């Protein structure tokens, strides 16, 4: 529940009431919808924890929050998730007009507990295998024919890897986001996981000579009869780029889902003779970064293309790709 900006009263002027409601909507947009949903779920979990132990959730004492973090860790919750849940608790307190537990005098216990949780319950990163260029081309080769499903699936894989897109970004891509230019294609990403302020970002995809992602996308648009301009309004079309197909392979108006991408990756890596258990929808995004790192692309260019917030995250792909380059034991092993 969001704290009121002003005490509401039916006696307030209607213009002021409308302004307050509008301001509430703006406040609600301060965090990505996925973050708001996660915070709401995290707060409910904390409330259940407090109810079961007959302690107060709001305002919560720092010791209770620290105990919550410990119990979560012993129950198998990942340290990163516990950190987010503590952030959700702090956020809810501030929303309700209370000092956050992490800002109170005895708050040091929370920071120390989180540090201990990270050290004691640290998990090895379970990274999925990247679909680099060679693997992606093997996956594309398994999709035979020129039917709508084959044409669509090839475009999804190629654009997904070429743009280092998240599954959700492929599913939410709209025709109005596409801009074909002489060098290839620019795709607008109105909002992404790392872009909570919704500034939007452009992703440039060259024509290419090997995977040819832009050509494969053009083939899908032509085969499905999709136009970037709405024929009725004359404006850029808000309709989805990648559509669901019926069982008889007819194009629908509904967008694919992120699960569509994940299933497509799994099925094509299996058909290519690869181990599907180590691949996921993220393999397309990871594949671009791993391939770019192997080709010694600029770290900053890679970060800009993948829209990562942290340069360290991108640097991990470079380290993985260069693990055997100039190896310390090369001259004696």
Residue ranges and their predicted role:
Residues 1-333:
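Extended, non-catalytic subsegments within catalytic or DNA/protein-binding/adaptor domains
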């Amino acid at each position: 529940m969001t704290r009121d900006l002003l005490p509401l009263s039916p006696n307030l002027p209607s213009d002021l009431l409308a302004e307050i409601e509008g301001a509430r909507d703006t406040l609600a947009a301060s965090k990505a919808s996925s973050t708001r949903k996660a915070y709401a779920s995290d707060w409910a979990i904390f409330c259940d924890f407090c109810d079961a132990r007959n302690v107060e959730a709001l305002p919560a004492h720092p010791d209770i929050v620290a105990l919550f973090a410990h119990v979560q860790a012993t129950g198998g919750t990942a340290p990163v998730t516990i950190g987010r849940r503590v952030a959700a608790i702090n956020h809810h307190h501030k929303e309700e007009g209370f000092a956050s537990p992490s800002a109170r005098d005895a708050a040091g216990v929370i920071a120390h507990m989180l540090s201990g949780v990270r050290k004691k319950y640290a998990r090895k990163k379970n990274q999925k295998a990247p679909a680099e260029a060679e693997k992606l081309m093997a996956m594309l080769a398994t999709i035979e024919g020129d039917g709508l499903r084959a044409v669509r699936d090839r475009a999804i894989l190629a654009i997904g890897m070429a743009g280092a897109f998240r599954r959700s970004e492929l599913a939410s891509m709209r025709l109005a986001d596409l801009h074909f230019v002489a060098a290839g294609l620019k795709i607008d990403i109105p909002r992404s996981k790392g872009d909570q302020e919704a500034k939007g970002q452009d992703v440039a995809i060259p024509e290419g000579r090997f995977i040819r992602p832009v050509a494969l996308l053009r083939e899908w648009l032509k085969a499905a009869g999709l136009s970037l301009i709405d024929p009725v309004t004359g404006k850029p079309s808000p309709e989805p780029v990648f559509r669901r197909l019926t069982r008889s392979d007819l194009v629908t108006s509904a967008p694919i889902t992120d699960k569509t991408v994940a299933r497509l990756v799994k099925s094509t890596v299996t058909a290519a003779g690869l181990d599907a258990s180590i691949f996921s929808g993220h393999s397309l995004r990871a594949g671009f970064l791993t391939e770019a790192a192997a080709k010694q692309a600029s770290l900053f260019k890679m970060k800009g293309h993948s829209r990562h917030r942290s340069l360290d995250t991108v640097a991990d792909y470079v380290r993985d790709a260069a693990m055997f380059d100039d190896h310390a034991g090369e001259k004696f092993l």
